[in-house]
UniProtKB/Swiss-Prot annotation:
Homodimer or homotetramer. Keywords: Cytoplasm, Polyamine biosynthesis, Spermidine biosynthesis, Transferase. This is Polyamine aminopropyltransferase. One of its GO terms (molecular function) is spermidine synthase activity. It comes from Methylococcus capsulatus (strain ATCC 33009 / NCIMB 11132 / Bath). It is found in: Cytoplasm. GO terms for biological process: spermidine biosynthetic process. NCBIfam families: PRK00811.1, speE.
Length: 285
């Protein structure tokens, strides 16, 4: 919400906290068939996209999220050629995926085309890869897309979704994970944004349990900073048909494209498990 002093504030009542950003102006607001989208110009974080009152993307720190949702999984898979991005309408994850020359096809499936069109207008740097011949943008229900896809047709699935409410709620259950498992090839990996380890620990633990129930052999969670998200600390959880410890470190160290956060050392560090998190997994998984 915006208050009289020109601050945008997102409150987290369940955790007794909030995030506020000083704004210069509201640039856009609309209600789509799926959600309410707002764009602000802020004093310190550049442009900010807000969906249903929740911060999604800012100019200043989006690189943290997009790099960590993509490069760790792509350097864990032995040979990622085909990638699906479920959600990801701001196109930042698509841009990072297509920095990998070995990727031959990347399909982004987002239910709300307006997110992408507004990103193209207000966050054009995130959409630089939209015209890449390897990219395909679909504006349909990602859950239905996965359900109708053939067996063993994709190497990596990235679920770059909003919080597990509204249009994204169906992306956090066993039925969806089973369909992803079916669609993945032998060494296939699913990675899904999994909220804050401080605020949403039971959700992450349940994701590990449900992913394994859906047939995945291994699960691992990686951690990274994300200032505009609840608690400022975020996570992504991988589920693999095979070994998730096969980090292609030589390839990561020799990467031919620039990143602002991700490198081989960050990759290793991101998977370090805090004691409280390990305890929760042992208790709840």
């Amino acid at each position: 919400m915006c208050d009289a002093q020109d601050w945008f504030t997102e409150s987290y009542p369940d955790n007794g906290s909030a995030l506020s950003l000083k704004i210069r102006a509201k640039l856009h607001e609309e209600q789509t068939p799926f959600q309410r989208i707002e764009i602000y110009d802020t004093e310190s974080f550049g442009k900010l996209m807000v969906i249903d009152g929740c911060t999604m993307v800012s100019d200043r720190d989006n690189f943290l999220y997009h790099e960590m949702m993509t490069h760790p999984v792509l350097y864990t898979h032995p040979a990622p050629k085909t990638v699906w991005i479920i959600g990801g309408g701001d196109c930042g994850s698509l841009r990072e995926v297509l920095k990998h020359s070995e990727v031959e096809k990347a399909v982004q499936i987002d239910i709300d085309e307006r997110v992408t069109r507004l990103a193209e207008r207000y966050f054009p740097e995130l959409c630089e890869a939209n015209g890449d011949p390897r990219a395909e943008l679909l504006f349909i229900d990602g859950i239905q897309w996965v359900k109708e896809a053939p067996d063993g047709c994709v190497d990596v699935i990235i679920v770059d979704s909003t919080d597990p409410v509204g249009p994204a709620e169906g992306l956090f259950n066993e039925a969806f994970f089973r369909q992803c498992h079916r669609c993945l090839r032998t060494d296939g990996i699913l990675v899904q944004q999994s909220e804050s380890p401080l605020f949403h620990l039971p959700l992450i633990a349940s994701m590990h349990r449900i992913m394994r129930q859906a047939g995945f052999a291994q699960t691992r969670t990686l951690f990274f900073p994300q200032f505009i998200y609840p608690s400022g600390w975020w996570s992504a959880t991988m589920a693999g048909k095979g070994d998730l410890n096969r980090f292609r470190a030589d390839a990561a160290e020799a990467k031919l494209f620039p990143t602002r956060y991700y490198n081989a050392d960050i990759h290793r560090a991101a998977f370090a498990v805090p004691e409280f998190f390990g305890d929760a997994l042992r208790e709840l998984v």
